[in-house]
Amino acid sequence: MAKITYIQHDGAEQVIDVKPGLTVMEGAVKNNVPGIDADCGGACACATCHVYVDEAWLDKTGDKSAMEESMLDFAENVEPNSRLSCQIKVSDALDGLVVRLPESQH
């Protein structure tokens, strides 16, 4: 299991054990993390699982695909460290990953 810390816009933290092979979004949804709406269910089609990856983890989460880049155009307050959490596959290498959630997904 990889421990992932989800930090809400207000600073509240939730640390979740996520099984390798799942996505950061799936870990959030399975554990009722507020702020990850995941309207499309993880199909990279809605941008409602937008997160900010902690700078220390950017290299370990992999590159954004062209599709993810396109979908981020629909997210609010996009930053250079913005990712769609449905596109970050959890592995043991991501144990300790920290992501911050935007104020709103819509």
Swiss-Prot record:
Which PROSITE patterns does this one have?
Answer: 2FE2S_FER_2, ADX
Which residues does the annotation say bind [2Fe-2S] cluster?
C40, C46, C49, C86
Secretion signal, residue range per the UniProt entry: none
Q: Which UniProt keywords apply?
A: 2Fe-2S, Electron transport, Iron, Iron-sulfur, Metal-binding, Transport
Q: Name one GO molecular function term.
A: metal ion binding
Cross-referenced InterPro entries:
2Fe-2S_ferredoxin-like_sf, 2Fe-2S_ferredoxin-type, Adrenodoxin-like, Adrenodoxin_Fe-S_BS, Beta-grasp_dom_sf
The GO annotation for biological process reads: P450-containing electron transport chain
Q: Which prosthetic group or cofactor does it need?
A: [2Fe-2S] cluster
Q: Where is the 2Fe-2S ferredoxin-type domain?
A: 1-105
> How is the cofactor bound, as the UniProt entry phrases it?
Binds 1 [2Fe-2S] cluster.
User: Cellular component per GO?
Assistant: cytosol
What family is this protein classified in?
A: Belongs to the adrenodoxin/putidaredoxin family.
UniProt name for this protein: 2Fe-2S ferredoxin
Organism name: Caulobacter vibrioides (strain ATCC 19089 / CIP 103742 / CB 15) (Caulobacter crescentus)
